[in-house]
Amino acid sequence: MQHLAIFGGTFDPIHWGHLLIAEAALQQISIEKVIWVPSLNPPHKKASAFRHRLAMLQLATQDNPAFTVSSVEKNRSGVSYAINTLTDLSVCFPNTHWYWIVGLDTFQTLPRWYRGQELAPMCDWLIAPRLVGGENIAQSELICKQVKQQLRKQSNTIHWHLLHIPLVGVSSSLIRKLYRVGKSIRYLVPEDVRSYIADHKLYSEDSE
């Protein structure tokens, strides 16, 4: 049985923080590959065109053989839901033990996800805390245990692992904001991604 991790998200744009999280998952958990899955229609966000986000992901991950980018959501109609993504990928990759990489804030909302109670036991959850440090790790672990308790009340089990990652104070929303006002995003994103953003005028008033 192979062990694969899904890293789903808007990735608008992908940045070094995302890449560090995926690399930490590879190093700390016995998985063979990380499958990056950009959301076609995120349920709570307005995002740049799917083709741009997919292209930036491909540029950022192309030099790591343990990273692969999936366009499984490309032809999906309606809102992108995690359980549909996992079901579709399970058809493409049978006989797989699945992991799902997710940020702590997002994991905290899992009990409220669409069919979240059904999704929770279908994979192991790899949690990226917002901050790294003694107190923050303890707080992150407490939040994960609270999610587990909420799901247990609904007769569901869940397995989670807290990833240990370097502190990176960067987010996609910060990058978009900086770029929109003409500030540098060099070293916040891979250079190929920065060039792509400039070439396609993303995150500006005349963006494609």
Curated annotation (Swiss-Prot):
GO MF = ATP binding; nicotinate-nucleotide adenylyltransferase activity
Q: Which gene encodes it?
A: nadD
Name of the top EC class for this enzyme:
transferase
* Name of this chain's protein: Probable nicotinate-nucleotide adenylyltransferase
Q: Which InterPro entries does the record cross-reference, listed alphabetically?
A: Cyt_trans-like, NadD/NMNAT, Rossmann-like_a/b/a_fold
Starting at the broadest rank, the lineage of the source organism is: Bacteria, Bacillati, Cyanobacteriota, Cyanophyceae, Nostocales
Q: Which family does it belong to?
A: Belongs to the NadD family.
Instruction: Name the EC number(s).
Output: 2.7.7.18
Q: Keywords in UniProt for this one?
A: ATP-binding, NAD, Nucleotide-binding, Nucleotidyltransferase, Pyridine nucleotide biosynthesis, Transferase
Q: Name one GO biological process term.
A: NAD biosynthetic process
**What species does this protein belong to?**
Trichormus variabilis (strain ATCC 29413 / PCC 7937)
Q: Which reaction does it catalyse?
A: nicotinate beta-D-ribonucleotide + ATP + H(+) = deamido-NAD(+) + diphosphate
